[in-house]
Each structure stands twice: as structure tokens, then as C-alpha cells.
């Protein structure tokens, strides 16, 4: 980055909060506002996707009312700090503070595991509705729906995002957690290669990684956007191969870990994860 660019960044940064505050009130349509889609519009969306619509709630909600908690409350208590379990819950974040919401008057909407506080269970920042995406067409249908209705859109794979961008109060969720496609190709050829090239793989919303071996051709594993590192490691091991990944096995392999640099145990030998993908498949939308 040039020095001029750095200086411009520091001069612009102080005015950003003021600009953002002016725009937030009318930025996106949120749940509970008159602009929110009605039941018929959500029914129409449901007919275009492969799975029923999600209605996420904070996982602690099964412990309420305190006078008659659900039988699932014991499961929540037993797995509350389990990263794999939390990634399986559409309404759970890895950092529970991102499930809460603080209003301008400093009141809080949250659902606490400690039911002795006497505070009612609230939705907090957990999206009230979403799409359980299993394919590229599911994702496209969800994005187009959000665009049509000007909804605040969030995407969650495992909920590890350190900035809490996997969730937002009153938003519309795309949950990619079940897009678990895994393919091993010992002679990988990227899509779009010359027609005479063999073994071309036509991806479906995936990320393709090198897997390491000593040969004169490219060997690769294709991972769906919902694959977690424990899935990827188990799959690569069955092929007798290794893949550069993160130390936390519950983190998504094709998400923020790659985009944020991707440091892992094999990085000193094979480099950062951001340099390993060789053929990401992206979806195009008309904005």
C-alpha cells in the first residue's frame, strides 16, 4: 500500500461513524417493520428452495419458561461451550455476546442460559427467518428475495466470525452449514480449461484446495462452503493426503479463514491458506 493511500485512510476514518449513523435508520428493511415481507411472500420463497424455511431462535430458549423448560434444555447446558454443537444450531454464534442486542437506551434483548436472572428470553440479534441452503440455486433464490424486499442479509456457516457478521437483529439469514460437498481429484483440471483437457470438474459453490503429494500433476480436494476443517481433514486423510487448514476444527474451510489470511499448523511449510485455493466457484447476481 502506498503512503498516500495510508494517509487517506486515516483522514477518512474519523468521519465514518457519523456518516454511518445517518444512513442506518433507512438502510434495510428489518423484521417488525411495515416493509417486512408477508406470509404469502415467504410461502412463495419456500416453494423455490429445497428445504423448509428456518425460524432460528437462541439455543437457550428451550430453557424458558423457567417453570416448564423443554427437555432439550439439558442438551443445551451440556453442549453450551462445544464449538461443533454450536455450529449445528442456526441461531447460535460461537461468541454468545453476538446473539444479544443492545438498544440505544442501553436495554438488552438476550436469552441467557442463567435463568435465575429473572430476565425474559428475547430474540436478541438472532435472525427470525432464513434459508437452509443446500445448493447454489438455494443461495441465489435467497439473495434475490433479500434484494427484492431490501432485507438486511447475513450469511452464516459456523458462526465463528470475530466481528459478529454472521448475525444481525431483524435480518434475513442464509445458512450454508449443510453444503458439505467433498470431492477428491488426483488429476485436477480447472473449469474453463481447453476442451481437450481431461478430468475437468464443474463446481457448485465450492472452493478447491491443493492437497500435498510429490507428483508432476495437480491433486486437489473440492470443498463445499459448509465443510468444516474436521470434515476436510478426515476426507483428505482417507485419500492419504494433507490439506492446509486451521487449528480449530469446527471453523468453516471455505469461509473467513481463507479470506482473512488462513494461518494454520502447516503454514510454515506450505504457506498461508489464502494462497492455497486454486479454483473458487462464485455465484453471480444482478444487483
Which role does the model predict for each range below?
Residues 2-272:
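N-terminal accessory segments
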Residues 272-287:
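Active-site and channel-lining beta-strand-loop segments
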Amino acid at each position: 500500500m502506498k503512503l498516500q493511500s495510508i494517509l487517506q485512510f486515516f483522514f477518512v476514518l474519523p468521519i465514518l461513524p457519523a456518516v454511518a449513523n445517518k444512513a442506518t435508520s433507512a438502510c434495510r428493511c428489518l423484521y417488525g417493520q411495515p416493509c417486512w415481507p408477508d406470509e404469502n411472500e415467504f410461502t412463495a420463497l419456500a416453494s423455490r428452495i429445497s428445504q423448509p424455511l428456518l425460524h432460528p431462535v437462541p439455543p437457550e430458549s428451550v430453557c424458558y419458561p423457567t417453570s416448564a423448560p423443554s427437555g432439550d434444555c439439558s442438551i443445551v447446558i451440556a453442549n453450551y461451550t462445544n464449538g461443533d454443537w454450536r455450529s449445528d444450531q442456526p441461531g447460535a454464534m460461537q461468541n454468545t455476546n453476538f446473539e444479544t442486542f443492545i438498544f440505544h437506551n442501553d436495554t438488552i434483548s438476550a436469552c441467557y442460559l442463567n435463568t435465575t436472572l429473572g430476565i425474559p428470553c428475547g430474540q436478541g440479534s438472532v435472525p427470525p427467518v432464513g434459508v437452509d441452503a443446500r445448493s447454489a440455486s438455494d443461495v441465489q433464490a435467497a439473495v434475490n428475495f433479500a434484494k427484492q424486499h431490501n432485507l438486511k442479509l447475513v450469511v452464516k456457516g459456523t458462526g465463528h466470525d470475530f466481528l459478529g457478521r454472521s448475525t444481525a437483529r431483524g435480518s434475513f439469514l442464509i445458512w450454508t452449514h449443510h453444503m458439505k460437498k467433498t470431492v477428491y481429484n488426483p488429476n485436477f483440471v480447472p473449469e474453463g480449461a481447453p476442451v481437450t483437457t481431461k478430468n475437468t470438474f464443474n463446481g457448485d459453490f465450492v472452493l478447491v484446495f491443493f492437497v500435498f503429494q510429490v507428483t508432476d500433476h495437480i491433486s486437489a480436494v473440492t470443498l463445499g462452503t459448509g465443510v468444516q476443517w474436521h470434515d476436510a481433514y478426515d476426507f483428505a486423510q482417507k485419500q492419504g493426503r494433507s490439506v492446509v487448514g486451521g487449528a480449530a476444527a469446527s471453523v468453516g474451510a471455505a469461509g473467513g479463514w481463507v479470506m482473512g489470511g488462513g494461518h494454520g499448523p502447516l503454514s510454515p511449510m506450505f504457506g498461508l491458506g489464502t494462497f492455497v485455493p486454486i479454483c473458487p466457484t462464485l455465484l453471480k447476481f444482478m444487483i
